[in-house]
């Protein structure tokens, strides 16, 4: 029986994520060039400039990225309720692969950093997959990669994003403010009431959601979690013009072509001036790079292969084992989410932040190159 074709919404999502990934590559490369040019002083000064009481970098990471997480939440809700993750048979393979792809990189990192109190808090940095970057690489490879593997990678990355949100909420939360948390709970109750009352206009949700972000910012829980929480309250119906679909389609180009590239430009810049090989081989950048390059592929491919071998899940249609491995390697492109978690873990420590960037850039770049080489040498098992 032929596999079910992805919906037009899902195809649009794949296309926008892939195009956004290519733009992200360009802006990240531009940030590296500027950070190592005579313009580096102006670049870093601009990121630390104050605006409305916070630095530009802080505003991007806490403000714009909340919109990114809002889109992530909308995608998760859509896929779980009516898309590629709407039943258990569709969830098993990407779900198990995502779990393996989070656990093994963390173990690789901890193997090198467990005895270092200064660096151990970065254990979650190599557990992430950048869906835009990975799909951008697949887009450059053209039709040699089966659509089923693109859907598998997208579903895995969406589950991975959900895991990252849980990690941020549970392990990277500052000192809690109980009055602010009470305000968060009250605002969430109001959003839930709007949903129960079947309010279909987006403006009430967005206005109340802005208040949720402000309360979350004061609560000690990272403000980007507000984006996920807001997304869960946006109504989704069967029709194409439901509030969730309208908001997702409205946000997708702004996030893919604007917010994510801006984040990459602001966070990928690291100066290599005076960077010695001994610093690159320290446990923090090495643990991140090896976690992304080896931990991800071992965790994703090993878990997926075992699930298929044991009969728990079916191999993506038209995909060979080598192609599945190639996509597993691409999951080591952590970039956006890895840099974001690294900023949460070491944001106040410039030296550690630079080490994180070096590890993320090295692990992500090597994963992209190796994964591409594997897939370039593969042919579909059906051909």
Swiss-Prot record:
Organism: Paramagnetospirillum magneticum (strain ATCC 700264 / AMB-1) (Magnetospirillum magneticum)
Keyword Nuclease: no
Highest taxon above the source species: Bacteria
NCBIfam families: NhaA, PRK09560.1, PRK09561.1
Alphabetically ordered keywords of this record: Antiport, Cell inner membrane, Cell membrane, Ion transport, Membrane, Sodium, Sodium transport, Transmembrane, Transmembrane helix, Transport
Protein name: Na(+)/H(+) antiporter NhaA
Pfam families membership: Na_H_antiport_1
Catalytic activity: Na(+)(in) + 2 H(+)(out) = Na(+)(out) + 2 H(+)(in)
Protein family according to the UniProt entry: Belongs to the NhaA Na(+)/H(+) (TC 2.A.33) antiporter family.
Molecular function terms, GO-annotated: sodium:proton antiporter activity
